[in-house]
């Protein structure tokens, strides 16, 4: 019977290389979102800051595909929950997942998967734009839902969690679409 390392070396070299490349892509995707989270702008009358996270979530999902985007954003959440300062403004911990911004954070993996599933390698401009818009809607649905749950007032949650971000997020959807279309041929993990 061979040593355990013999089992690992039996996989064909291209499979090992592809798996390693995929792990690197997922890790880079998580780090891109972590860096984007550090760009924060406080918004009056809401506990939710404006960040570049949603833009990064859409781009990571669009470039890595549904499974890769889901894995990258799940990794991102795990890093933050483990105490690494990857959430907005260098924060971390479970308090951010159960607090006012938690709904957005928990929606990120789903949004990345939606973008990746709909904005595949052959998707044109319109399909990619719609994928990004739908994914942004997923992010806002999660965020507003958690704000409503915590505050008990759905109308106030909508005013605090969606209205101040609408215009900026339209721009992020357009920019994400352009970045996905411009970069996806360079990323092998795109579906």
Describe each region flagged by the PLM:
Residues 122-191:
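Membrane-embedded alpha-helical hairpins and interfacial helices in multi-pass inner-membrane proteins
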Residues 37-44, 83, 88-91, 119, ...:
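Short helix-capping/hinge motifs at transmembrane helix termini and TM-loop junctions
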Residues 63-67, 114-122, 182-187:
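Structural signal for the C-terminal ends of transmembrane alpha-helices
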Residues 23-28, 55-59, 69-75, 101, ...:
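Hydrophobic alpha-helical transmembrane segments
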Residues 27, 31, 35, 59, ...:
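Generic alpha-helical transmembrane segments of integral inner-membrane proteins
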Residues 42-114:
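Alpha-helical membrane segments and adjacent membrane-interface helices in multi-pass membrane proteins
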């Amino acid at each position: 019977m061979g040593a355990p390392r013999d089992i690992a070396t039996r996989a064909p070299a291209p499979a090992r290389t592809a798996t390693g490349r995929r792990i690197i892509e997922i890790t880079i995707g998580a780090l891109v979102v972590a860096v984007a989270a550090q760009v924060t702008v406080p918004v009056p009358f809401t506990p939710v800051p404006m960040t570049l996270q949603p833009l990064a979530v859409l781009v990571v999902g669009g470039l890595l595909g549904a499974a890769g985007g889901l894995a990258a954003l799940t990794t991102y959440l795990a890093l933050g929950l483990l105490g690494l300062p990857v959430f907005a403004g260098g924060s971390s911990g479970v308090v951010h997942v159960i607090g006012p911004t938690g709904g957005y954070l928990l929606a990120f993996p789903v949004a990345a998967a939606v973008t990746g599933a709909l904005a595949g390698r052959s998707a044109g401009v319109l399909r990619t734009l719609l994928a990004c818009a739908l994914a942004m809607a997923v992010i806002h649905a999660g965020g507003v839902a958690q704000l409503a749950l915590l505050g008990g007032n759905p109308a106030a949650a909508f005013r605090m969690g969606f209205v101040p971000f609408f215009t900026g997020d339209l721009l992020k959807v357009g920019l994400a679409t352009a970045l996905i279309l411009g970069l996806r041929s360079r990323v092998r993990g795109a579906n």
